[in-house]
Each structure stands twice: as structure tokens, then as C-alpha cells.
Amino acid sequence: MNTKYIFVTGGVASSLGKGIIAASLAKLLQARGLRVTIQKFDPYINIDPGTLNPYEHGECYVTEDGAETDLDLGHYERFLGIHTSKANNVTTGKIYHTVITKEREGAYLGKTVQIVPHITDENKRRMLLLGKTGDYDVIITEVGGTVGDIESQPFIEAMRQLQWELPEEDFLSIHLTLIPYLKAAQELKTKPTQHSVQELQALGVHPDIIVCRTEKELSPELRHKIALFCNVKPGHVIQSIDAWSIYQVPLNMEAENLGKMVVDKLEIPGLPEPDLEALKAFLERLKHPLHEVDIALVGKYVELQDAYKSIQESVVHAGAANSCKVRVHTLQAENINDGNADEVLGKMDGILVAPGFGERGLEGKISAVKYARTHNVPFFGICLGMQMAVVEFARNVLGYAEAASTEVNPRTPHPVIDLMEDQKSTTIKGGTMRLGAYKCRLAEGSLARSIYGTEEIAERHRHRYEFNNAYLRQMQEAGLKVSGVNPDTGLVEIVEIPSHPFFIATQFHPEYKSTPEHPQPLFVHFVKACMDRR
């Protein structure tokens, strides 16, 4: 069987959920026994989102091989339970960088380098790249942006060319659009969708399936109207109605017959019925919890829902694993101090201090750590959260009042968190942090070892600063146990306080490897500790 290529575009408005639709379709195909992966093409000129402010772009998701990518790759991995890579996220910046580098090397033999064919050819090469590995039966490509945006037109043009270069049964186009509901008229309006599809068709791409995001049910008459004016088969207009959980969307799409439509169009015979039992069991636990807890998520970017997307989803997975409803209270670190910590955090069953960069909000994070440590509240720190746990311990247990990270105070007399040695000569910001999966050896008898149930793990990282091992002995003697280290470098990966009911913090980002069917163990045990306290 030839590799099949599916493209998902969006129209009318942004943030309709192309990534969720792409991941849901991938789940339906995977459940039928196909090998599927998803790639995201982003139209911005940044090489990657690694240097983007979370307020600009939401979470930066890190893959196993150390790529800093769009947060949609997190959805892909969570829905499919697979690892993506740097090849799964392409930006306009990467495309231009490749083409300009080739031009400087003389690869174009003196030709004038243009959007068409040089940029579009590179787009096509990247779109087909994963398919040529032989590892996948189906490649789903999510095209970022909204049809009509000037930035994404080279991607659409590459799609147009592939639509005619590939065999008809190997190419499929899905267009996700919005059907707004006007309360005054009490009507769903199809005109924006008609115009969006017409604009896509004017660019030479003819969608095979139209997925309509809607608050209300689409009547058969409306579906027929959309099909008529958008030139698709009547049965190929489907609805994606608002769901109570994003993990319900694959089941909704299966009920809409999306999986069968795609398989039939791509002419893939002999597939079994989809096996979605594990997903259904997860949703059953999620929908009917037996317990409930309240957890504080203390961060710097809490105003934007997507800034801590993987953490939020990991908590959902852990809650379902414990049959527990977890209410996450996102708290701005800048608003927390020693004086109000009891008022702000006193009703919480657990405290999670989130990752981040820079000085803003650090003292609030330290106050949150102190409250959790001194009031026996279950505590979980991630990346910067671990670093602030170390600073808090140094200040309030070791008595080093001026202890700090050199990230914010290069002249501190007690640099308990310091810049990694191999980072001190780095001047370029993009893609130069310690990124991707690294091994961590767990100490025998530690909480971390009991949680993971193994001696060695591999987790993903995104940081420049580390625990200063010059303070290792003092910290351990005072009660902060180092329970996880990198076996090659000795870099401290996990700290915990054995005398505390549950106090653990990691330099790595465990949230990047949690899925509904395989929830991350640290999150599962953190939620369990919160339940035990309640």
C-alpha cells in the first residue's frame, strides 16, 4: 500500500481545533490498525517557538529528540501514544532558512530563487518526508493559520500541487470551518463556510470533507446546503459539536462516520472495526469520578490557558487514573507572598509550582514552596519549580538568606542554582538549551524510585540552569534528598523531602510524556497524595 496523505486546513476563524480534529482522525485510523503520525506546518517565520513568549504562542512542547515545537504536537502524542520528532513540526522560518542556505551553497545553479517553485518545492519535500521513511501508512498534515492568510499561501500552493502529483486515492483534504449561531435570528449561518471553501477552491485545493465546528446540531437540510454550495458529497459534511472533553472528540467523529469516509476515499480495504475500548474506559473514569481535590497551579503565565497545556492535561490523566475530579486553580505567582500565602493556598489539597523563565514571580513561587513545606501540603515542582524549591530550602532551612539562582542574581553569595557549565559560552538563544530526553538514575529507597518502580528512567528537559552540586552535601544533611541524577554528568534531576508527606520536584518536564492510557507516574502519585490529605 502506498503511503496516504491527509491535509487539514481551517477557515473562517482561528482556534477552531484543527489539531484536535487531526489527532482525533489519527486516533480513528490507528484504532483500525494503521500506522499514523501527524505533522504541523506553522506559517510564522520563527525557526521554532522556542524563543516565543507563552503569551504569544502558548506552551512550547519538547519532543523526545529535543525539538521545541508547537503545542499541537502534545495533542498528537497524547491522543496516539507515540513519539513525534523535529520532523513533525515545520515552520516557514525553517523552510526559508533551508532554501536560503541552499542558495548560498550554489544549489540552484544561478537561478532566481522564488516562492514558486523553490519555497513550494521545499514545502512539498517536507510534507512527504515522513511518508518516505516507510514507518507510516498515513501522514496527516495540519496546516496552521486560516485559509486566506497571506502567510499560509505557500503551504496551500504546495498542497495544490500534491493534489495532482499524487494518485487520487493517496490524497485527501479536510477543511475545518465555523458555523456561527446567531441568537437574535436563532439560526446557524452557513455563508462564512461557503466563502471559506470558495476561497480554498480559488487557490486550487478542493476539500473532500468539510468538518463544521458548531454549538448546535446541524440539520440534514443544512448539511445538504453546505455540500451543494461547497461542491462536496452530501455525506461528507460532518459536525464537530462542542464536547465535554477533547478526548470525547474521536468518539464523536466516529459517530459522524469520519473514519469510514477517509478509509473509503483512500481505498484502504480489509481494515477491522476500530478498537476504542481503552479510550472509552478512560472517559468513563473521567466522567464519573469518585473523589475530588483542589490543586493550586502557581505560575507566571496563568492568564493564558494554553501556557501550561501539558501540565493541565497530565493532571486530567492522573485524575482519571485515581477516579478523582481535579479542580485546578491557576494562581499568578506575583500575587503570592508570605503574608497572604495561608489565605491564597490554605484551602488547596496540593500545590504545583510550574516551569518558567526570568525574575518575575519568583518570590511568589518561593512563598508557595515554603507554605507547602511548612504546612505539609503535597508539593510538586517542575523545572523552575524545582529550582525555587532548592532556593527556598537554602534560605529557610540552611539559613542562607541571600541564596538565589544566578539567572536573576549573578552576584548572590550562595548560587544554589547556577548556569550549566556548557551554557556559559553560549550566546545564541534559539535551540541551545538542554533539550530532549536524558537518563535519570533513581536512588534506592527514595519516593521517586517507589513511584517509577525502576532504577533508571528517561524524561524530557528544557533548561539552562541546574542545581549547584557544591551545595549537595549541605542540602542532603539538612533533609533535602537528591533522589535522581543524570548517570553521565551527575546533574541533579529530582529532589524530595523524606520527612514530608509528599514533597518532590524535578528538573525535567514529566508532563511531556503523559497520555490518557499511560498517565505520568509523578502526576498520578501527586493527585493520590492530595486525595490522602483531603
Report residues per predicted region.
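Acidic/polar loop patches that form or flank catalytic/metal-binding clefts of enzymes
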Residues: L271-P274, F380-G381, Y400-T406, R449, ...
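C-terminal and late-domain segments of enzyme folds
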Residues: L435, K439, A443-R534
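Extended hydrophobic-aromatic, low-complexity segments
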Residues: L304-A307, A320-C324, D338-A341, R360-G364, ...
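Active-site proximal loops enriched in glycine and acidic residues that flank catalytic Cys/His/Asp
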Residues: G10, K40, T214, I241, ...
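Cysteine-nucleophile active-site neighborhood
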Residues: L16-G19, A23-K27, A31, V344-K439, ...
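Flexible phosphate-sensing "switch/lid" loops adjacent to ATP/NTP-binding sites
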Residues: M1-R327, A333-G350, F357-G358, K365-Y371, ...
